[in-house]
């Protein structure tokens, strides 16, 4: 469920040595399954352990996860990175805002999942987003851009070279392409 790098494990062990015996870490998601989802890591003293918590054993400590957060932390990774700017702990949880869908889920659900978990986080850097409007009988995903993508001069490139390539690679034989249904209006909100 959660992968913790060796450097992050060493960092946690160092921090936990300064805590009372039996203290572990807790990884959680606040507002899971929403666009406002936020992940966190905290100390978890023995008296804060719930019987329903999942215990993920690591070297020298356990990682506890509450049942509500668990499905949103599938494929989460925690790393501790040191560079010229210093050190930082990173937690990446690609499913925090939306539960991972099964490989055999309907195509429309799998496309929506990829848009929300992979495409929109990249577009968000420009204040943009994309949503799936419909999936046609001829296997075309009809998309609508919003935010900074609406009216952006790079939207055609983003659609064909970015999103379409990514979706066709993920769903070969199931999807024939993507089309933009957005009525683009250039304005101050447009990224380019």
Swiss-Prot record:
<dbReference type="InterPro" id="IPR034904">
    <property type="entry name" value="FSCA_dom_sf"/>
</dbReference>
<dbReference type="InterPro" id="IPR000361">
    <property type="entry name" value="FeS_biogenesis"/>
</dbReference>
<keyword id="KW-0004">4Fe-4S</keyword>
<feature type="binding site">
    <location>
        <position position="152"/>
    </location>
    <ligand>
        <name>[4Fe-4S] cluster</name>
    </ligand>
</feature>
<feature type="binding site">
    <location>
        <position position="149"/>
    </location>
    <ligand>
        <name>[4Fe-4S] cluster</name>
    </ligand>
</feature>
<keyword id="KW-0408">Iron</keyword>
<dbReference type="InterPro" id="IPR017726">
    <property type="entry name" value="Fe/S_biogenesis_protein_NfuA"/>
</dbReference>
<dbReference type="GO" id="GO:0016226">
    <property type="term" value="P:iron-sulfur cluster assembly"/>
</dbReference>
<dbReference type="InterPro" id="IPR035903">
    <property type="entry name" value="HesB-like_dom_sf"/>
</dbReference>
<dbReference type="InterPro" id="IPR001075">
    <property type="entry name" value="NIF_FeS_clus_asmbl_NifU_C"/>
</dbReference>
<dbReference type="GO" id="GO:0051539">
    <property type="term" value="F:4 iron, 4 sulfur cluster binding"/>
</dbReference>
<comment type="similarity">
    <text>Belongs to the NfuA family.</text>
</comment>
<comment type="subunit">
    <text>Homodimer.</text>
</comment>
<dbReference type="Pfam" id="PF01106">
    <property type="entry name" value="NifU"/>
</dbReference>
<keyword id="KW-0411">Iron-sulfur</keyword>
<dbReference type="Pfam" id="PF01521">
    <property type="entry name" value="Fe-S_biosyn"/>
</dbReference>
<keyword id="KW-0479">Metal-binding</keyword>
<dbReference type="GO" id="GO:0051604">
    <property type="term" value="P:protein maturation"/>
</dbReference>
<dbReference type="GO" id="GO:0005506">
    <property type="term" value="F:iron ion binding"/>
</dbReference>
<protein>
    <recommendedName>
        <fullName>Fe/S biogenesis protein NfuA</fullName>
    </recommendedName>
</protein>
<comment type="function">
    <text>Involved in iron-sulfur cluster biogenesis. Binds a 4Fe-4S cluster, can transfer this cluster to apoproteins, and thereby intervenes in the maturation of Fe/S proteins. Could also act as a scaffold/chaperone for damaged Fe/S proteins.</text>
</comment>
